[in-house]
């Protein structure tokens, strides 16, 4: 696997212990890792401003993306082998140096944005889009769930065309991006970051997760 994009959910970023565990796993993986953070509590502030100041959906969309960058900076302090990247060219250059690229997504999305500018779009779709732009082998969405549940069990693999909504697992536009660009997306429990080692190596993983493909 040459390029792995990992989106770290905002809820996971609240815990220093969880961040440390994820960082330790990522630091030990082979080169080619790109991290996209969630907006978390900072995106919640934008939601509040959206209501109180009556800003437009477009304005809120880009403000929320800018809010993600606060977590980017925070993560860069936790990963010494990382570098903050605000362009696709910087990401590629950082990966060629064997470092972890932590994305500052605002400028990238401003320049190449095919996403609807609304609250229906979250950092999930932004991470998947960045993965598409980089030609990533896999995009992993680290969440606080084991994967997508169907009839009470985590589904190992799911076709994007077989479902219309991802509900609480990810924003629904992720499905559209998977269908349109044939990108592979895995939903993984961020409390079990060791799963990443199996995904990168291609070995059978004993832990549950869901791989969504076109």
Predicted features along the sequence, with ranges:
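C-terminal catalytic "cap/lid" subdomain
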Residues: 1-214
């Amino acid at each position: 696997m040459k390029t792995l994009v990992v989106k770290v959910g905002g809820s996971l970023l609240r815990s220093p212990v969880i961040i440390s565990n994820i960082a330790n796993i990522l630091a030990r993986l082979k080169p080619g890792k790109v991290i996209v953070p969630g907006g978390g509590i900072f995106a919640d502030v934008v939601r509040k401003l959206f209501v109180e100041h009556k800003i437009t959906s477009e304005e809120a969309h880009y403000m929320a993306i800018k809010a993600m960058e606060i977590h980017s900076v925070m993560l860069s302090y936790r990963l010494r082998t990382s570098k903050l990247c605000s362009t696709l060219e910087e990401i590629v250059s950082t990966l060629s140096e064997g470092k972890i690229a932590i994305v500052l997504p605002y400028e990238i999305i401003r320049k190449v944005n095919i996403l609807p500018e609304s609250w229906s779009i979250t950092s999930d779709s932004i991470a998947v889009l960045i993965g598409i732009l980089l030609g990533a082998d896999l995009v992993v969405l680290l969440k606080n769930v084991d994967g997508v549940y169907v009839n009470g069990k985590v589904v190992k693999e799911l076709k994007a065309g077989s479902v219309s909504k991802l509900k609480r697992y990810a924003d629904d536009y992720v499905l559209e991006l998977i269908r349109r660009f044939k990108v592979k997306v895995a939903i993984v429990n961020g409390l079990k970051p060791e799963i990443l080692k199996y995904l990168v190596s291609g070995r059978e993983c004993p832990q549950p997760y869901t791989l969504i493909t076109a």
